[in-house]
Amino acid sequence: MTITRLKLISREFEGFEASFRVQADHFEKLTGCVVEREFEEIHRLYDRMIAGKEALNGGHDLFLCVTDWLPEAIEQGLLLPLDDLIRENPPEGWPDAWAPSMRGLQTGDDGKVYGIAYHDGPEMFIYRSDWFTDPSEQESFASRFGYPLDVPVTWKQFVHVAQFFTRPEKEMYGALTASYPDGHNNVYDFLIHLWSRGGELVTADWQPAFHEAAGREALQFLVDLIHKYEVVPKAALTMDSVRSGHHFAQGGIAMMWNWAGFAAVAEMPGMSRIAGKVRTGLIPKGDGPGGRHMSLNIYWILGIAAGSTQPEMAYRFLNETASAAMDKVTSMSGGNGTRLSTWRDEEVRKQFPYYEQIEAVHQNVKSPLPIPEYPAINEVLSQMVDDALQLRLEVPEALSRAAGQVDDILRRSGYRQNKEE
């Protein structure tokens, strides 16, 4: 008897490996189809599936793709539109079982849907609640800073709290970033700080704006956390989001902003030394009049590679994995489910309390530019942040250089010309 096989490729992450294992086993029992799974480092995943166009060669049926890459993937025809398949057999509860913020980024300019949300961020403020509620720590903080120890609302308060909890002699640091130059969190950190101070990446007429006052303050703040205030360990310069999330879970860090999934990691006894001691909240805002609580709306969608030789079976897996039961599996395995039912599930919230805040966080989210050229812009921003964090360039010079490069990309791609015409 011939065994039907699907091939799935995803970013490497323990949560994805665990959830897809359960979901693939479930699908095999349901249909007899074996789902072979491959997990790749994020840069390699982009280089292979998007830049190298492996999505076209028939080597993979299912592709877990981050929304940053979708405009380019859609423009290049690397993913199949799902509209006809959804019309014939919609996912359970489609579309209202998902928040609007979980449905928009996978919809192309043509109005077609190119994937179903599989794993959500968002980025959240994650902190050691046991340290914040310790009476002796509260007394010491109030004596030193003149106001009560609490979850910081502004970035100025964040620095105060980080300074208070930084005790290198005890291997304690007030904060942690994911500053490895992989074009992922190092860029997203800058965007969050830019937006939380009222800044924007570009203007309405497609001129770079991130090098202006809010951007200077944002990038300098990230540099200062490591080099001036010394509240972030220098090892953060070598940590991507996954490594920083696991480092936080080992204890010794008071606060970080990171993907909500790492709040899940911190609550899993097999991975964490601080389970039951972690809470989440809103990311702090800028101290000026433009300050606002902001997070990043970036998520991972499961789509069908355009070269798939079995798109109907691939959709059956996608559809089944999008069900309420399987979406909950994603969350219980250490990822972040995307359905409202998962976010509101009592068992999920008991295991991972941060789900109580996810809907509130989604009220104030922004996304990177939804244009095919964004990956190229992202690389410029990644180099800019790394040049500043590694002290190769002063912040104004790093920003100015990057703004010129982004301007060149936008001009070459016709955005400025189109606006001026």
Task: List each model region and its residues.
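Conserved N-terminal structural module of periplasmic/extracytoplasmic solute-binding proteins
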Residues: M1-Q76, P90-P95, S136-S140, P289, ...
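Extracytoplasmic/periplasmic substrate-binding proteins
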Residues: Q23, V187-I192, S196-R197, L219-Q310, ...
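Short helix-initiation/N-cap motifs at beta->coil->alpha
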Residues: E40-R48, V153-Q157, A235-A249
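A structural signal for short loop-to-beta-strand junctions that line the ligand-binding cleft
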Residues: A51, G58-D61, P91-F132, G290-M294, ...
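Hinge/lid segment of periplasmic solute-binding proteins
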Residues: T67-M124, N186, R279-I283, K350
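Helix-loop-helix "hinge/cap" segment bordering the ligand-binding cleft or interdomain interface
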Residues: I86-R87, T107-N186, G199-A235, A306, ...
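Periplasmic-binding protein-like
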Residues: K170, K228, L318-L340
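Long, aromatic- and glycine/proline-rich binding clefts that accommodate carbohydrate-like moieties
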Residues: G276-K285, S331-Q383, D387, R412-E421
